[in-house]
Amino acid sequence: MELLRGLGVLFLLHMCGSNRIPESGGDNGVFDIFELIGGARRGPGRRLVKGQDLSSPAFRIENANLIPAVPDDKFQDLLDAVWADKGFIFLASLRQMKKTRGTLLAVERKDNTGQIFSVVSNGKAGTLDLSLSLPGKQQVVSVEEALLATGQWKSITLFVQEDRAQLYIDCDKMESAELDVPIQSIFTRDLASVARLRVAKGDVNDNFQGVLQNVRFVFGTTPEDILRNKGCSSSTNVLLTLDNNVVNGSSPAIRTNYIGHKTKDLQAICGLSCDELSSMVLELKGLRTIVTTLQDSIRKVTEENRELVSELKRPPLCFHNGVQYKNNEEWTVDSCTECHCQNSVTICKKVSCPIMPCSNATVPDGECCPRCWPSDSADDGWSPWSEWTSCSATCGNGIQQRGRSCDSLNNRCEGSSVQTRTCHIQECDKRFKQDGGWSHWSPWSSCSVTCGDGVITRIRLCNSPSPQMNGKPCEGEARETKACKKDACPINGGWGPWSPWDICSVTCGGGVQRRSRLCNNPTPQFGGKDCVGDVTENQVCNKQDCPIDGCLSNPCFAGAKCTSYPDGSWKCGACPPGYSGNGIQCKDVDECKEVPDACFNHNGEHRCKNTDPGYNCLPCPPRFTGSQPFGRGVEHAMANKQVCKPRNPCTDGTHDCNKNAKCNYLGHYSDPMYRCECKPGYAGNGIICGEDTDLDGWPNENLVCVANATYHCKKDNCPNLPNSGQEDYDKDGIGDACDDDDDNDKIPDDRDNCPFHYNPAQYDYDRDDVGDRCDNCPYNHNPDQADTDKNGEGDACAVDIDGDGILNERDNCQYVYNVDQRDTDMDGVGDQCDNCPLEHNPDQLDSDSDLIGDTCDNNQDIDEDGHQNNLDNCPYVPNANQADHDKDGKGDACDHDDDNDGIPDDRDNCRLVPNPDQKDSDGDGRGDACKDDFDHDNVPDIDDICPENFDISETDFRRFQMIPLDPKGTSQNDPNWVVRHQGKELVQTVNCDPGLAVGYDEFNAVDFSGTFFINTERDDDYAGFVFGYQSSSRFYVVMWKQVTQSYWDTNPTRAQGYSGLSVKVVNSTTGPGEHLRNALWHTGNTPGQVRTLWHDPRHIGWKDFTAYRWRLSHRPKTGYIRVVMYEGKKIMADSGPIYDKTYAGGRLGLFVFSQEMVFFSDMKYECRDS
């Protein structure tokens, strides 16, 4: 009892010491998160379970959103501790579900706009991520190979000291990490007023899944002491590296002074006064004497245990029948028993004797088992008779039996093996009640049959004794039967039924017919007899006299049925198929005329040939496939019409495209009918495809393509950076895009004012950052180097910018070639460049960037195709491309004769090219006038991206309209677009305000593809492309964000951009400005501005220096939209079918928002109107 009292005193002293105020100089400071949130045993969102440490509670996280935050005052205490120690030590024991991502700890803003700091265990990547929200960006520091989400208990120790972080898992030291700013910059002193500390709760889908225990912040100690307390013997060596390494010249942040939970009343913590504590110290001195006595007793017990252990270590012995035997010693007890000693255990084994097949066996001296001895006597083979059995009846008459056995293997035996006799013990006393009893069973009877299945029977009598004086009769059956089986009985055969009579041998005059039967009812078996009788039977048939046949003279038409009557008359049936008549006279039917669509009609010709009899269809025309029916009669022709379909090698498998290429069907009029195109991740001519890492359409290695086919078969001169134009100014085999010095003048391109001209002197007279060697206006400042007429003389110094022969000061369209200088509205701006040629508007203001001046822009567009009604050549039929091939002012979409040759479009074999003669030499349905060039633009259909639009033949963004979406303010620069590859590649080089680069080609249905690449690791914002562009307020946009982030300016609306690909429709009531800017940044819907059609649910952001390939399909007629993004050869994101009919087509362009060095390479658009 004294010992227990002393231990209790020690415990109270420890509790008081561990809760002292900072001035008391304690050596430990612990902030247990689960204690701080109130209730360390239970609470919402968590359930108490058994943990790794049995002395402290563990919690299974069921719903982290319900777990309350740490109170503000406690959080403020913790912040003060962080500032005092310039860091912290974070401890946690966890058992995390396998391959999950979960937040251990997070500091989130109270306005729910995001997290400021979080510690996340990323089981999918095998890392521990520290996320810090810094001004203008977010830093994520990942400790690699932190395998925590294994389903097993793990213990982490995270030591953060200013801008350094060191992680320990159990006793293993992981790699260290460096923060962009000291930790005090994140854990500011006023942080508790704007943020709260949460445990296990993270962003969407980032809540912790598993069990947590001992989640604590520790101050006033070192990681070395913590790891040593955990039993990590090597913790000293592990920690010396970080403790002795001064960061940025500062002293170590973790000090030994204690900062714990604040309190004002010491006695409230300890529960004892100082006098009481003093008396406890005196009691402890008495306890010391008791402990010393206890130590002496324990020492004596220890010595006795040692003696007992030494005694047990002696060699084992065995004792048997009073005799001592050594270990492994063997001895014999008698002739049938042997024993041995094994580890102090006596094991004995008896000899097992076999059963002897004789009655005269004896055991020889010294042996254990008996032996049989031979005998020649017939009686010697028998064993002695057994004792008689008890009498079967206890009173009255009964029977007794005895038996003997014969050694038939060694002797011959004669006589019976069983003897039976009657017995009579006493007379039955019939004066008292007696229950009946069964006698012994009789022997089994012989089988009831001699063959097959039968039964055998045995009986017993109720006479042992018999019931008397109303005694109970015997219970049970008096007879017992069981089956017996003999050899199978023979089965005699039996006849089956007769078959029907067969056909008579003649129809008249007496003939014979026959029938038969089988011996199968049953079939003879097991020696049974065969059937008796005949197998077949005959009888006379058709005994009547034969009539006179009038059809023997063939009076009917060949193939018509002839019916003869007994009186010699006859009658003809219908004409055979393919003929018509009365059966006597028949003529051929012209199936081709009677059924005008029996065969394929091509170019107005019914491809059917009549024969006598019948008809046959001609083979399907060239480039068509189908059946070639033939037959007789109108009914056959109507039921078996010929169908010829245009042949499609892409579906019938007759193409020769590479397995890594896609077969694109061009139509049966094209020659060839298909084009092979390598899939994303591959490049080549489609027949041969090779690996293409940067997705710019050029293979990593040279390909052996067909003769003279070098396009996209040569090795990529920049295999890791998209450059679809393969520009190489100095011809050194390294593309300009990845060549640091394109002109070999020893001046790096990023500092060379003429990167493509050798100019080591770098002279720049006009100081426009364009060297004199390559400056198209060397004496006029013009950094943009604009040259409208492409004559080598820049616009800044040209006297005639557009090259129309009219000097600039007298030219009413300085940038547009217009010799006639027509100016209908007399506003000083020529009609060729006037955005309102019929209304006076010298300022040319165009607020919505739709190429229509505000003066004449009414934005009334009933068919939503981007062209207002009074300027739309089909105001009631959507036709965004405004195609009008006969230039009659009526668009092709609503013109029944597009080429004005007098042949309606539905019968014109050249719909866009005048050919009133409709000449078609090869009969393929395509007129000679438009053979292989349907729109007559001198570009073969196989190479024409829009074969039905004369105005569009190739992808070209060399001319584009720059559209700022936030034109006011100077927070960032305007986009800077660099054009390459004849307009098929554009690069945006600066961090800029939101803006578009929109081409001038207009489309209805379109496919748009290209390669997306970010060539920098700076920034993480938006880039993408637009389609269906009609104005700066009306367009579709596909935009991609790398990481989730709130826009820095919350006015006029808060904007939260989530990582991942988005498809949005812009229909802004305000147009470009801060409202549209914030709405574009925001992932979601903003009324009156932007509506999100789809966002990637996996929130996958783009990666730096990684090539992606996009494919857009837009069909305005049905509203179908689909965006697919490839990463290498695999699909990374797929929107699936989206349906939206807001806009019926428009222009294509590119989009950037606060993101630099965006490459749009190998771009390609194709019309899909037909």
Curated annotation (Swiss-Prot):
<keyword id="KW-0272">Extracellular matrix</keyword>
<feature type="repeat" description="TSP type-3 7">
    <location>
        <begin position="883"/>
        <end position="918"/>
    </location>
</feature>
<dbReference type="GO" id="GO:0030511">
    <property type="term" value="P:positive regulation of transforming growth factor beta receptor signaling pathway"/>
</dbReference>
<feature type="disulfide bond">
    <location>
        <begin position="551"/>
        <end position="562"/>
    </location>
</feature>
<feature type="glycosylation site" description="N-linked (GlcNAc...) asparagine">
    <location>
        <position position="248"/>
    </location>
</feature>
<feature type="disulfide bond">
    <location>
        <begin position="718"/>
        <end position="738"/>
    </location>
</feature>
<dbReference type="InterPro" id="IPR017897">
    <property type="entry name" value="Thrombospondin_3_rpt"/>
</dbReference>
<feature type="domain" description="TSP type-1 2">
    <location>
        <begin position="435"/>
        <end position="490"/>
    </location>
</feature>
<keyword id="KW-0037">Angiogenesis</keyword>
<dbReference type="InterPro" id="IPR028974">
    <property type="entry name" value="TSP_type-3_rpt"/>
</dbReference>
<dbReference type="GO" id="GO:0001525">
    <property type="term" value="P:angiogenesis"/>
</dbReference>
<dbReference type="GO" id="GO:0050840">
    <property type="term" value="F:extracellular matrix binding"/>
</dbReference>
<dbReference type="GO" id="GO:0005615">
    <property type="term" value="C:extracellular space"/>
</dbReference>
<feature type="glycosylation site" description="N-linked (GlcNAc...) asparagine">
    <location>
        <position position="708"/>
    </location>
</feature>
<feature type="glycosylation site" description="C-linked (Man) tryptophan">
    <location>
        <position position="498"/>
    </location>
</feature>
<feature type="disulfide bond">
    <location>
        <begin position="575"/>
        <end position="586"/>
    </location>
</feature>
<dbReference type="GO" id="GO:0010759">
    <property type="term" value="P:positive regulation of macrophage chemotaxis"/>
</dbReference>
<feature type="domain" description="EGF-like 1">
    <location>
        <begin position="547"/>
        <end position="587"/>
    </location>
</feature>
<dbReference type="InterPro" id="IPR013320">
    <property type="entry name" value="ConA-like_dom_sf"/>
</dbReference>
<dbReference type="Pfam" id="PF00093">
    <property type="entry name" value="VWC"/>
</dbReference>
<dbReference type="GO" id="GO:0048266">
    <property type="term" value="P:behavioral response to pain"/>
</dbReference>
<keyword id="KW-0106">Calcium</keyword>
<feature type="disulfide bond">
    <location>
        <begin position="451"/>
        <end position="489"/>
    </location>
</feature>
<feature type="disulfide bond">
    <location>
        <begin position="391"/>
        <end position="423"/>
    </location>
</feature>
<feature type="repeat" description="TSP type-3 6">
    <location>
        <begin position="845"/>
        <end position="882"/>
    </location>
</feature>
<feature type="glycosylation site" description="O-linked (Fuc...) threonine">
    <location>
        <position position="507"/>
    </location>
</feature>
<feature type="disulfide bond">
    <location>
        <begin position="678"/>
        <end position="689"/>
    </location>
</feature>
<feature type="disulfide bond">
    <location>
        <begin position="508"/>
        <end position="546"/>
    </location>
</feature>
<keyword id="KW-0703">Sarcoplasmic reticulum</keyword>
<dbReference type="InterPro" id="IPR036383">
    <property type="entry name" value="TSP1_rpt_sf"/>
</dbReference>
<dbReference type="GO" id="GO:0005783">
    <property type="term" value="C:endoplasmic reticulum"/>
</dbReference>
<dbReference type="Pfam" id="PF00090">
    <property type="entry name" value="TSP_1"/>
</dbReference>
<keyword id="KW-0834">Unfolded protein response</keyword>
<dbReference type="InterPro" id="IPR001881">
    <property type="entry name" value="EGF-like_Ca-bd_dom"/>
</dbReference>
<feature type="disulfide bond">
    <location>
        <begin position="620"/>
        <end position="644"/>
    </location>
</feature>
<feature type="disulfide bond">
    <location>
        <begin position="910"/>
        <end position="930"/>
    </location>
</feature>
<dbReference type="GO" id="GO:0006915">
    <property type="term" value="P:apoptotic process"/>
</dbReference>
<dbReference type="GO" id="GO:0016529">
    <property type="term" value="C:sarcoplasmic reticulum"/>
</dbReference>
<dbReference type="GO" id="GO:0016525">
    <property type="term" value="P:negative regulation of angiogenesis"/>
</dbReference>
<feature type="disulfide bond">
    <location>
        <begin position="777"/>
        <end position="797"/>
    </location>
</feature>
<keyword id="KW-0245">EGF-like domain</keyword>
<keyword id="KW-0395">Inflammatory response</keyword>
